[in-house]
Amino acid sequence: VMTSVAAKHAKGKKLKDVIFVTAGQALADAKENGRENVVNGTLGAIHDEDGNLVFLKTVKEEYLGLSDTEHIGYAPIAGVPEFLAAAEKECFGNSRPEGHIRSIATAGGTGGIHHLIHNYTEPGDEVLTADWYWGAYKVICSDIGRTLVTYSLFDEQNNFNHEAFKNRVNELAARQTNVVILFNTPGNNPTGYSIEDKDWDSILNFLKELVAIGRNNVIIGIDVAYLDFSGDREEVRGFFSKFGHLPKAILTCVCYSLSKGFTMYGQRVGAMIGISDDEEIADEFLEINKNTSRATWSNICRPAMRTMANIVADPVKFKAYEEERNSYYQLIRDRADIFKQEAAKVGLPMLPYRGGFFITIPTDSANAICEELKKEHVYVIALAKGIRVAACGIPKFQMTGLAEKIYNAMKRLGKL
């Protein structure tokens, strides 16, 4: 029996983060054998063609030029007001939904997901997401006494599986009042899949019918961490307008992040943006989440908020920023295209990639295959049902031939 003084709910907690562990192994290998000989497809961060972490110059310049007060001062608990306005503007683009919108600064996109689960479910409740999901969702749920449950994201044709989704939502709705559903789109981590507009229409029609019965509230959480790397600016944002004029029993919360789009991963800045047709529900959203912020991190990194606000407010700076960011989006797309074409050529199965940082190869033997690939200095992430490859971090010269390497490793192990 383990000696412990932890509270019952905390006993036995232990983080097994395969991503950071594998990333560490890749770095150690690169140190020993040279970076150009090691394929590091582990972390969700943009690296350039020389393997260096990218800090957008337009962002760096603005960040380093801030005054001391902006660099080290406290920020308001809800966030710097200019930042919140900029986050809404940049998140929604031309598709800002009609309705009452309230925003709160959060510790990256993760912080918003934490608050949403904490404040809109009861202890013991279940939270729903797709079976291809970012592992932190599960940790956030279990840490606060909730359970993450999943539906099959894809049907046989690799389209959104409406039947599986509806069945799962109905199961939850029968057991609990609030149904919290997390979507990670566009550019889902780990698959790169984006929910199409016609699928959103079906999803929302179904949820409207559900709340019309009068027993449930539905809280839609949308993690848009990869929004800026998933397609044409306005096209990928078009679906936001669908969240206006929904019944008041449906609350939408968009979890927006500066980590990827502004390359400020470790600064931990994002915003949770609530959308409701009912002003009281929108105001409640602001108050309860502000309170939880005070009780969790107190306030958010001021210089990163100010940097983003300044760039978005200045048309000249914003244009330069967008051009620079888009050049990296194009780079990631080119890398993904190399992999996609070569995978098709050798016959390596792959889930439908539309954008974002990652590509996924479905397999039940991810651990064994990833261990086999490490022998060839290839580091990718083993998931429960597949292998995640970070297109954001692998230079083109290393992306070339990678699909074949993975295919051959699977073949050697008899796992195709």
Model-assigned labels for residue ranges:
Residues 48, 321-372:
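Conserved PLP-binding catalytic core of the aspartate aminotransferase-like
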Residues 67-217, 227-246:
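Conserved core of the PLP fold type I
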Residues 86, 245-325:
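Conserved core segment of the aminotransferase class I/II
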Residues 100, 352-358, 382-386:
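Short Gly/Ser/Thr- and Asp/Glu-enriched loop/turn motifs at secondary-structure junctions
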Residues 224:
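Walker B catalytic acidic pair
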